[in-house]
């Protein structure tokens, strides 16, 4: 299929004229048959490659040769055909130049030396070549970057400074959530400790809470407290005493100096003995 297309393009380029011709409209199509050069009819000259295929029209050429303007040198048919093969629809007469449109016709100065026009012969010697290579500008335009991709000079530098090694307490500060400041303490998974160092577990019936030892002192010092005993004397049920004089011996025996307690008891015994009748 590609070879057929290449052969068709090759044939079209070989049959096309190599000399650019003026584009004629439909109203000026009669100028192909009738050329306004001294009111003489001219034969229809085909394009360059077809001149060797069709014989010339002898009747029109004889009439044209008889009606030549006197004073001009006769021009042979072979030379005229050769000129017609070079430039279609144009015949060069010595001392006179005619155009296919017939609008411009001027007399050349015989004193000036006439240089013969160098025109290309038919496509017999020149082989047309067809290039299918894409231009370099179009190939460069196809290279584009997507929107989400960074250009080489826009990529951020990924050099991150290594932070110094952190201790366990600093890592615990970073991992601690913000709601610990409001009193809620989540249950942290701690490593297994020996039996001697294990902390007591929270007992909901007795109301004992273990001390938080893993929390650093600078984060929340108010949370580090000693073990609090919420146990009441009657196992969680508070019953007020009905006696008028509360007994203070239970609370002061452990915290008061025993020497002071002796003096107080002696004074109390004296006052009791004085009050009795």
From Swiss-Prot:
Segment forming the signal sequence: 1-15
UniProt KW keywords: Biomineralization, Cytoplasm, Glycoprotein, Nucleus, Secreted, Signal
Keyword Cytoplasm in record: yes
Residue span of region Interaction with ARHGEF5: 127-129
Gene Ontology CC terms: cell periphery; cytoplasm; cytosol; extracellular space; mitotic spindle; nucleoplasm; nucleus; supramolecular fiber
Membership in a protein family: Belongs to the ODAM family.
Protein name: Odontogenic ameloblast-associated protein
The organism of origin for this protein: Bos taurus (Bovine)
